[in-house]
A protein has these predicted regions:
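Charged, alpha-helical interface segments at or near domain boundaries
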Residues: 1-161
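C-terminal structured domains
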Residues: 164-270
C-alpha cells in the first residue's frame, strides 16, 4: 500500500520496482525471486549479459537515483537495469539497486563495464535522419553509418541519430568513449549531441551552422511539446571533441572559451 501511495504521488516506476526488489532480497532472498519467475537474479554471472545502462539528467532525477547503483558522467547520471525480457513489445526489467549489487558481491565498476559491453552486443546504430524519415514513408532499412567515413559536403541535411537496434534506452551509448570516437571519425569533425530522449540522441556536426543558444532552445521546445515527461533525457546540449572524444556541456564550453580568450587578450596587452 505504501509503495502504491508513493507511485500515485509521483514516484517513478523504476524506483518502485527497485523498492520491491530490495524487499524481496531482504525478506527471503532467492526463494522469493523463484516465485517471481526470476530464479537466477542473484547469480551475477547469469545476469551480467542482461545488464543495460540507463541514462538521465542527474539534476532532474534525484529521487529515481536515490537507491540505485549510479555513475556520474558530466550532466548525466547512469543507472543500471537487468533486462529480464526484451522483445518487440518492450522491455521487462529490474533496476540494479545497492542491495542487489551487494548480493552479487561485485563493484560498481564491474557493473558499469559489463553493462556497457552488453549494450554494444545489442547493436550500435548511427543513422541519417533523412533516411529514417524516408524509411517510415517508403519502407526499407536505413544504413548504419557508424563505421563509414562520410563526405559531409554531399550530405544535404547533416543530422544523425545514435541508438541501438531495438531503439529502446539507446541514448546511454553516448557515454562510451570509443563510440564517440567512431562518430567523430565518421563525420570528420567535432559534433553536438542533442539529448532528444532516453531512447536516442541526435548528432549534429559542428560545421558553423548551429549556434548553442538556438540548439538549447530547440531541445527545450521539443521536450515541452513532443516528448513524454518520463522519456525526456535532458535539456542540456553537449559538445564532443573529435580528437579527444571528450564530451562537455556546450554552453559551459563556450563560456570557458570566451574566458580563456579574454585572458589571452589581457596577457597580450599586459
Amino acid at each position: 500500500d505504501s509503495l502504491y501511495q508513493e507511485y500515485i504521488h509521483g514516484k517513478d516506476v523504476d524506483s518502485c520496482v527497485g523498492d520491491v526488489a530490495d524487499m524481496r532480497i531482504e525478506a527471503q532472498g532467492k526463494a522469493e525471486f523463484l516465485d517471481m519467475g526470476v530464479p537466477d537474479i542473484l547469480d551475477y554471472e547469469k545476469m551480467k549479459n542482461k545488464l543495460q545502462v540507463r541514462i538521465c539528467d542527474k539534476e532532474w532525477n534525484t529521487d529515481r537515483l536515490a537507491d540505485k547503483v549510479v555513475t556520474e558522467h558530466g550532466d548525466f547520471a547512469a543507472y543500471y537495469a537487468v533486462n529480464l525480457e526484451e522483445n518487440g513489445e518492450g522491455i521487462s526489467s529490474i533496476p540494479v539497486t545497492v542491495s542487489l549489487m551487494n548480493e552479487w558481491g561485485v563493484s560498481v565498476e564491474q557493473i558499469q563495464a559489463d553493462a556497457m559491453m552488453a549494450d554494444k552486443n545489442r547493436g550500435v546504430q548511427l543513422v541519417d535522419m533523412t533516411q529514417i524519415v524516408e524509411s517510415m514513408i517508403f519502407g526499407g532499412t536505413p544504413k548504419n553509418l557508424l563505421n563509414e567515413k562520410l563526405d559531409m559536403e554531399t550530405v544535404e541535411n547533416p543530422m544523425f541519430c545514435l541508438t541501438n537496434e531495438s531503439k529502446m534506452n539507446g541514448a546511454s551509448l553516448l557515454l562510451q568513449e570509443d563510440i564517440r570516437k567512431q562518430i567523430g571519425e565518421c563525420l570528420g569533425s567535432d559534433f553536438f549531441v542533442i539529448p532528444s530522449s532516453v531512447h536516442e540522441v541526435l548528432i549534429l556536426p559542428d560545421n558553423g551552422i548551429f549556434q548553442v543558444p538556438e540548439l538549447n532552445a530547440m531541445v527545450q521546445e521539443v521536450n515541452e511539446t513532443q516528448v513524454e515527461r518520463q522519456e525526456q533525457l535532458s535539456d542540456k546540449v553537449q559538445f564532443c571533441d573529435k580528437k579527444t572524444a571528450v564530451m562537455e556541456n556546450a554552453e559551459r564550453r563556450e563560456a570557458r572559451l570566451e574566458k580563456e580568450k579574454a585572458a589571452e587578450k589581457a596577457e597580450v596587452k599586459g
